[in-house]
Curated annotation (Swiss-Prot):
Organism: Neisseria meningitidis serogroup C / serotype 2a (strain ATCC 700532 / DSM 15464 / FAM18)
InterPro entries: Cbl-indep_Met_Synth_N (IPR013215), Cobalamin-indep_Met_synthase (IPR006276), Met_Synth_C/arc (IPR002629), UROD/MetE-like_sf (IPR038071)
Gene Ontology BP, a term: methionine biosynthetic process
Family per record: Belongs to the vitamin-B12 independent methionine synthase family.
Organism lineage string: Bacteria, Pseudomonadati, Pseudomonadota, Betaproteobacteria, Neisseriales
Entry's cofactor comment: Binds 1 zinc ion per subunit.
Any Pfam family hit: Meth_synt_1
Binding annotation for L-methionine: 433-435, 486, 601
Annotated binding of L-homocysteine, by residue: 433-435, 486, 601
Enzyme class: transferase
Protein name stated in the entry: 5-methyltetrahydropteroyltriglutamate--homocysteine methyltransferase
Residue positions binding 5-methyltetrahydropteroyltri-L-glutamate: 16-19, 112, 517-518, 563, 607
Length: 758
């Protein structure tokens, strides 16, 4: 019989119950016991949903109050020593301080989990890091599930992935792989504690196998699993997010009891494991997207596998369901307004039922679930033929693009002369990245307008009042290129998604980004186009209030793609180019309306990089082409800006230069301008604006600090190509500190301009 198991479930609840309880606890509105009770209830509900899908094993150990990698840092005693906490007796309060910081220590750094939009807390390893086992987190959840009469499989991230996703810290140079011999016995202790608590199978996740691991890391798998296999539970080694076919010989030789492979992201890898002689777990339902599967098609893959493997075939989702929203059935508005689209979707609970149907079809024959299979086929057929998805005009526009459609009319050297002729900017021109503080009044007006409690005219008046204030304050500060402040925008992707065709939105489609922060990504379900102008009215109103140049503000095609649930029936590159052409319509309309400085934000270009470097060039080529398409056809005198914020540029600088924006602004203040050195060494050809202060903190920098950063920038970038700006948008800041911070920036700029003029 085929076995059905789960690897992980969303933690936050169907209606973000965990988020609201956490935040109440942080505000001291509920007790620790009340928070623990909410969490216990959510875990129980999750397990019951898995059991209702006829699962042979429910997942335990996947639930966390913040992040599963933070749980592992606690379980292995690897929490940062700088906090002075005892990992053996860590309170919940201290656990949250590790994640959020306290008055003495900054929070543990966060970064994206592989190529997902989930953030984990990065382990800090020192040459002298000592490990100590504390299996309480995993054992407690196992015992809770057992008390409900459920068969449970604990899930733990493996030792090599744990070390891989960490960072080396401290003054002594070392390779974190050298900590493995100290870490392994601690893992053995944790696994033994689970065996004692009654675990029959333990899942050990090693997604690091899907990236370009150095040879010595790959070699280490032999010793690690030779050691872990001595534990008297069966081990399922789980891989996901990509192919591990290149490691097939190694994986087949490891003394584990089973292997999980992701057949959604990498269906082609099945051939490499067809002769595997132990349990093979097939990840056949997408754990990262929201589309209903065509179950007949899935069965075409797994039925031959079952014939070959018999009882050794297990089935599951491709990875943990953490990355999908909880329950489609609560989306009543979507069901009423877009019934077809509703029928094409599957959230976590629907995916559990898809797996139930597949298990039944494999074990009892397709006839036992004929009705469910017919419904799945009908949804797939309707989606394949829908005129709402497939639009001839969009397809024709893409197909008819001439060669070099993504190129500006002239090279940068000519464009910058045409731009400076009318802009007439001083040395070290100043600007803002885009947004200004989103006050309570702005949020209330937007919410009231959405609920129908505020008329369109009153809403527009409220937004115009905010725009006028933003323009006035920038003029008082003597900024050179102004922004309108984006008061009308709730979110930089959602705002555009609501105005483009081919997008849809949910009410409760939340997924965890980190800790208590959840995001509700738009759904790109069909061909994308722009029915009418999206930003022109706001930007032209702002421009009417000032003689200084006003910057139009758009979110770039790659970022819109990366931060959405994307259709899976055509290549992502095609979707991205469709978005680019829709944005290009907006760019040309802004230009026509007299807005001749236009920013196209691309904070997510780096996030889209594939896990394997061999695939980078193809991605960077279409991502760069999409950006250029969005600004193509502009006059030379129109200045295109872009903004990016991340900590690593060196390896993709040629691709960033190839985007050919006239001005790029980047986040650099927290790295003391280190990032800029890469641009200098690369001889980045166009204008550049390194952030001179950190907007993520309410702290007002001193003039000396800003001057230090600006002088460092002048050493690296020719001063005639240097802009001055904050690190990022000011949406999350208060007005008081915003004005004080900008005043410091302007004072330093005026001082250095005077000095350079001598």
């Amino acid at each position: 019989m085929t076995t059905l198991h789960f690897s992980g479930f969303p933690r936050v609840g169907a209606f973000r119950e965990l988020k609201f309880a956490q935040e109440k606890y942080w505000r001291k509105e509920i007790s620790e016991q009340e928070l623990l009770a909410v969490a216990k209830d959510l875990r129980e509900k999750n397990w019951k949903h898995q059991a209702a899908a006829n699962a042979d094993f429910v997942a335990v150990g996947d639930f966390t109050f913040y992040d599963h990698i933070l749980d592992l840092q606690v379980a292995t005693g690897a929490i940062p020593a700088r906090f002075g906490f005892d990992s053996q007796n860590l309170s919940l309060e201290q656990f949250f301080q590790l994640a959020r910081g306290n008055k003495d220590q900054f929070a543990i750094e966060m970064t994206k989990w592989f190529d997902t939009n989930y953030h984990y807390l990065v382990p800090e390893f020192h040459a002298d890091t000592e490990f100590k086992a504390n299996a309480k987190h995993y054992v407690q959840q196992l015992q809770e599930a057992q008390a409900l009469g459920l068969k449970a499989k604990p899930t733990v991230v493996g030792p090599l992935t744990f070390l891989w996703v960490g960072k080396e810290k401290g003054t002594v140079e070392f390779n974190r792989l050298s900590l493995l011999q100290k870490l392994l016995p601690v893992y053995v202790e944790i696994l033994n504690a689970l065996v004692e608590a009654g675990a029959e199978w333990i899942q050990i996740d090693e997604p690091a196998l899907t990236v370009d691991l150095p040879k010595e890391w790959v070699e280490a798998y032999k010793d690690v699993y030779a050691t872990l296999s001595k534990v008297s539970a069966k081990i399922l080694l789980s891989t996901y997010f990509g192919s591990v076919a290149e490691h097939a010989a190694l994986l087949k030789s490891l003394p584990v009891d089973g292997l999980h492979i992701d057949l959604v992201r990498a269906p082609e890898q099945l051939d490499a494991f067809a002769d595997y002689d132990k349990v093979l777990s097939a990840g056949i339902i997408d754990g990262r997207n929201i589309w209903r599967a065509n179950l007949n098609k899935v069965l075409e893959t797994v039925e031959p596998l079952q014939a070959k493997l018999g009882d050794r075939l297990w089935i599951s989702s491709s990875c943990s369901l953490l990355h999908t929203p909880f329950d489609l059935s609560v989306e009543e508005k979507l069901k009423a307004n877009k019934p077809d689209l509703y029928s094409w979707l599957a959230f976590t609970l629907q995916k559990t039922q898809e797996l139930r149907v597949l298990k039944a079809a494999l074990n009892e024959g397709r006839d036992s679930v004929a009705e469910e299979l017919a419904a799945s086929q009908a949804a797939a057929d309707s989606r394949a033929n829908s005129s709402e998805i497939h639009r001839a005009d969009v397809a024709k526009r893409l197909a008819d693009l001439p060669a070099n459609a993504d190129q500006r009319k002239s090279p940068f050297a000519d464009r910058i002369k045409a731009q400076q002729a009318w802009l007439n900017l001083p040395l070290l021109p100043t600007t803002n990245i885009g947004s200004f503080p989103q006050t309570t009044e702005i949020r209330q007006a937007r919410a009231a307008f959405k609920k129908g409690e505020l008329s369109a005219a009153d809403y527009e008046a409220a937004m115009k009042k905010e725009i006028a204030l933003v323009v006035e304050e920038q003029e008082k500060l003597d900024l050179d290129v102004l922004v309108h402040g984006e008061a009308e925008r709730n979110d930089m992707v959602e705002y555009f998604g609501e105005l483009l065709s081919g997008f849809a939105f949910t009410q409760y489609g939340w997924v965890q980004s980190y800790g208590s922060r959840c995001v509700k990504p738009p759904i790109i379900f069909g061909d994308v186009s722009r029915p009418e102008a999206m930003t022109v009215a706001w930007s032209t109103y702002a421009q009417s209030l000032t003689k200084r140049p006003m910057k139009g503000m758009l979110t770039g095609p790659v970022t819109i793609l990366q931060w959405s649930f994307v259709r899976n029936d055509i290549p992502r590159s095609t979707v991205c180019k469709q978005i680019a052409l829709a944005l290009n319509d907006e760019v040309l309309d802004l230009e026509k309306a007299g807005i001749k400085v236009i920013q196209i934000d691309e904070p997510a270009i780096r996030e889209g990089l594939p896990l394997k470097r061999a695939d980078w060039d193809a991605y960077l080529n279409w991502a760069g082409e999409s950006f250029r398409l969005s600004s193509a056809g502009c006059e030379d005198s129109t200045q295109i800006h872009t903004h990016m914020c991340y900590s690593e540029f060196n390896d993709i600088l040629p691709a960033i230069a190839a985007m050919d924006a006239d001005v790029i602004t980047i986040e650099t203040s927290r790295s003391d301008m280190e990032l800029l050195t890469a641009f200098g060494e690369f001889k980045y050809p166009n204008d550049i604006g390194p952030g001179v202060y950190d907007i993520h903190s309410p702290r007002v920098p001193t003039e000396a600090e800003v001057e230090h950063l600006l002088r460092k920038a002048i050493e690296v970038v020719p001063v005639e190509r240097l802009w001055v700006n904050p690190d990022c948008g000011l949406k999350t800041r208060g007005w008081k500190e915003t004005l004080e911070q900008l005043q410091v920036m302007m004072n330093v700029t005026h001082k250095l301009r005077a000095e350079l003029a001598k």
